[in-house]
Amino acid sequence: MEFHFDATFFAFVGLVLFLALVVYLKVPGMMARSLDDRADQIRNELAEAKRLREEAQHLLAEYQRKRKEAEAEAAHIVAAAEREAQMLTAEAKKKTEEFVANRTALSEQKIKQAEVEAMKAVRSAAVDLAIAAAETVLGKQADAKVQSELFGNAVGQVKTRLN
């Protein structure tokens, strides 16, 4: 058997030596370990991304719930403010009506009092005028004693009727 040492043979020997060197230096194990480490890193990153996504969804749901609660509370506050404004308006209207009614009653009372005082003044003036007229008529027609008697009686009657 004859061996030919041609280029193919040396290429084959170089390949075998290279593969032996690679196996001796444990390159396939290092590659497998490196790929496993990379796979673990990717798996951990995916798990972290999933956890962050779930946390973000949870926070989003919580913020949406809080927003709805805030909107409901704002609507409640607005409704309460509207009710209070209506109550204050009604109360102010009632107080204004009461004030106007009281002022009207007071004005009517003052008018009635003025009417009564005017009637008293007119009666007093009429009595004074009647007394003066009676004095004049009696002064011309009666003597002093009769005049004095009539005057006293008339004044007494006027006093009793006015009081």
Curated annotation (Swiss-Prot):
Alphabetized UniProt keyword annotations: ATP synthesis, Cell inner membrane, Cell membrane, CF(0), Hydrogen ion transport, Ion transport, Membrane, Transmembrane, Transmembrane helix, Transport
Bilayer topology annotation: Single-pass membrane protein
Cellular compartment(s): Cell inner membrane
Transmembrane region(s): 5-25
Its job: F(1)F(0) ATP synthase produces ATP from ADP in the presence of a proton or sodium gradient. F-type ATPases consist of two structural domains, F(1) containing the extramembraneous catalytic core and F(0) containing the membrane proton channel, linked together by a central stalk and a peripheral stalk. During catalysis, ATP synthesis in the catalytic domain of F(1) is coupled via a rotary mechanism of the central stalk subunits to proton translocation. Component of the F(0) channel, it forms part of the peripheral stalk, linking F(1) to F(0).
Family statement drawn from the similarity comment of this UniProt entry: Belongs to the ATPase B chain family.
Subunit structure: F-type ATPases have 2 components, F(1) - the catalytic core - and F(0) - the membrane proton channel. F(1) has five subunits: alpha(3), beta(3), gamma(1), delta(1), epsilon(1). F(0) has three main subunits: a(1), b(2) and c(10-14). The alpha and beta chains form an alternating ring which encloses part of the gamma chain. F(1) is attached to F(0) by a central stalk formed by the gamma and epsilon chains, while a peripheral stalk is formed by the delta and b chains.
Main location per the UniProt record: membrane
Protein name: ATP synthase subunit b 1
Gene Ontology CC, one term: proton-transporting ATP synthase complex
Encoding gene, per UniProt annotation: atpF1
Tree of life domain: Bacteria
A GO MF label: proton-transporting ATP synthase activity, rotational mechanism
